[in-house]
Amino acid sequence: MTLLKAKGAKLIGVADMDEFAVDGMNRGVAVAIPVPAYIVENIRTAPTMEYYQMYHTLNEQLDNMVEAGAEYLRGQGFNARAYTKKSLSVNDDLRTAFPYKTVATKAGLGWIGKSCLLVTEKYGSAVRLSGLLTDAPLVPSKPVTQSRCGNCQLCVKACPGNAIIGTNWTAGMPREEILRAHVCKETQIARMKQILGFYEGERICGRCFAVCAYTQKYLRQSSSVASD
């Protein structure tokens, strides 16, 4: 955990992954780093090139982080596999073999918001995620199993594609009850082409997580610290 913090992880948790175990590796380590507040401030209405560039920078940082973590665990005699952004493929149903958000909820980092993004107490949804699997006997964190969004509808109203259904999540709930994932995808692509002038395979939008009440709390706290 110390190594991951040194590499920039701001949130770290351990998940019991017995039901998703691979080659005996039944512990998932979830890590998160926040999107800088100044980036989030500028994407409440539309994606920006600044955000697009930061998106790639943070993904690369996360890849390096979990690769270093897995290498360290292997050096200690355990099996470990880093699930980097560059190694994971997205299938036609927009799913991956290692669902970062599911691992993060099981590791206690946060819950799934109405936007179908992870929501954390400290940073809201303004986080990027990654993780690894290992058979090291790590003590699991307390999982989060219920939404804390309540009656909030900010992300639902902000979505330019009306892709967010507005359901409060509980662990195990099908994604289809929360988000029209393919509508979200097509909206992201269309907005990137319209606003940024290109689409090269990586999709961004950001409105839903930028307006999130928990994200807004993070922005206010960041502004307060900066002004002190």
Model-derived features: where do they sit?
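Non-catalytic, usually N-terminal nucleic-acid engagement modules in DNA/RNA processing proteins
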Residues: M1-N64
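Catalytic cores of enzyme domains
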Residues: F20-D23, T57-D228
